């Protein structure tokens, strides 16, 4: 995510949306292509999601989003569909880190999650730490510079690759005795 402004339509769901409905377990070890993983996103919760989602769209949910098993595809299926961010009242810790480590912005903002309605236009201003929707503007706690670096790089793997490449191309520092 290099864009500091995310704009899209809200896809709103409830509390305790677990990883089994984000990405069905039956595909966990059988699919590896991005397009195949994307096609099965939320199919048991919202069969219209994968065909209808557009780049920049935002998932909005209640409490404990991403609970359940540690399934990386629960985050990557959203990334592969172009989801710009997930806004929730709260996240399962394991999903939260999986999302960030895969370049998916996960925002804890209970007021926005409650105010946003399904299908409405949503704007996430990352630089201002604000969510805007028809009901108004809602502030969220900023992510640390390190975490934002990971998200902006497109995930932890890309972040580490970039850091290693930068270190490899940096001029050698003289050794001091």
Tell me the role of every PLM-derived stretch:
Residues 1, 7, 18, 55, ...:
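Exposed boundary/loop context
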Residues 1-26, 31, 158-177:
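N-terminal, positively charged, Ser/Thr/Ala/Gly-biased leader segments
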Residues 12, 23-25, 29-128, 145:
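Feature captures the catalytic cores and cofactor-binding loops of soluble hydro-lyases/lyases
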Residues 17, 66-72, 151-160:
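Conserved phosphate/anionic-ligand binding catalytic regions in large, soluble enzymes, centered on
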Residues 102-177:
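Acidic, glycine-rich flexible loop/linker segments
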């Amino acid at each position: 995510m290099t864009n500091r402004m995310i704009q899209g339509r809200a896809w709103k769901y409830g509390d305790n949306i677990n990883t089994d409905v984000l990405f069905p377990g039956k595909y966990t070890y059988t699919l590896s292509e991005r397009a195949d993983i994307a096609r099965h996103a939320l199919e048991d919760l919202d069969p219209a999601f994968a065909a209808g989602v557009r780049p920049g769209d935002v998932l909005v949910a209640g409490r404990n989003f991403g609970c359940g098993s540690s399934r990386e595809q629960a985050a990557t299926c959203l990334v592969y569909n172009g989801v710009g961010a997930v806004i929730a009242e709260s996240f399962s810790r394991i999903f939260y880190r999986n999302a960030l480590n895969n370049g998916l912005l996960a925002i804890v903002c209970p007021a926005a999650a409650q105010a946003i309605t399904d299908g409405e236009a949503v704007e996430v201003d990352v630089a201002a730490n604000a969510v805007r929707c028809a009901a108004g503007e809602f502030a969220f706690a900023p992510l640390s510079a390190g975490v934002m670096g990971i998200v902006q790089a497109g995930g932890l793997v890309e972040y580490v690759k970039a850091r290693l490449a930068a270190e490899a191309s940096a001029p050698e520092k003289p050794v001091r005795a």
